[in-house]
């Protein structure tokens, strides 16, 4: 038995009696702590007083390298932190070396993309009042070019070239990229530009403005898109990120060109684009059969 185990056994008996935890919960605590004991034994640590923050970070890193998901590591780290708090409480340790050490960031689930049919339904707006025209234009541009919310609100008049059907946006790290825009987006921008002067003060640079006659805020855009999602009877909530995600998925489904989608989205790393988009296996197999020279069999 490891020299580290007796204090764990004492701790498990303590929480079983004092906190009335179920046998299943106690077993989970025991299992989580056992992984740390194994790692400490590998690092020749024979006493809990030898544990420090650097070792805790090393163990977290090791678990991550072994392929454990962020949520599992967070659960194990929480169990270790509680155990070390117990050791501090009974003066075995002077401080908790796991306090303040975070698990890897939890993987954020991707938003469900909007289907092509639902996207057409969202953008098929009948209302012709100025705010509706502006909102339709914002959503058309976002879906047309896969814009981030910050990129959309940051667009200035000088950034858009309708004759060339292109727009310059400023992304993360102040990096600029030139993007194509669809004919439909060009048409809605032209309509918006005709009525825009009614909304803004003289010399306002922003393409999209609010009723306060200044650049529209990100929060305002989010609220307006959510409103249109409800009004157009779309399933689920509509938000700017979902439009960007849908653009990426639809483009990848149509082209199968991950590199091109990476460039359009402004991702520095291709891995980000791979995570950002999701295609079902059937569609990926179809792209593979069309693209791989050895997948094309002679009939």
Swiss-Prot record:
GO cellular component, one term: cytoplasm
Classification via SUPFAM superfamilies: DNA breaking-rejoining enzymes (SSF56349)
Described purpose of this protein according to its UniProt entry: Site-specific tyrosine recombinase, which acts by catalyzing the cutting and rejoining of the recombining DNA molecules. The XerC-XerD complex is essential to convert dimers of the bacterial chromosome into monomers to permit their segregation at cell division. It also contributes to the segregational stability of plasmids.
Family annotation (PANTHER family): PHAGE INTEGRASE-RELATED (PTHR30349), TYROSINE RECOMBINASE XERC (PTHR30349:SF81)
GN (gene name): xerC
Active site: 148, 172, 241, 244, 267, 276
Keyword annotations of the record: Cell cycle, Cell division, Chromosome partition, Cytoplasm, DNA integration, DNA recombination, DNA-binding
Principal cellular location given in the protein's record: cytoplasm
PROSITE patterns in the record: CB (PS51900), TYR_RECOMBINASE (PS51898)
GO biological process, one term: cell division
The name this protein goes by in its record: Tyrosine recombinase XerC
Residue intervals of the Core-binding (CB) domain: 2-88
Any one GO MF annotation of this record: DNA binding
Native organism taxonomy: Bacteria, Pseudomonadati, Pseudomonadota, Gammaproteobacteria, Alteromonadales
Cellular location(s): Cytoplasm
Source domain of life: Bacteria
Record InterPro entries: CB, DNA_brk_join_enz, Integrase-like_cat_sf, Integrase_catalytic, Integrase_recombinase_N, Integrase_SAM-like_N, Recomb_XerC, Tyrosine_recombinase_XerC/XerD
The Tyr recombinase domain, residue ranges: 109-289
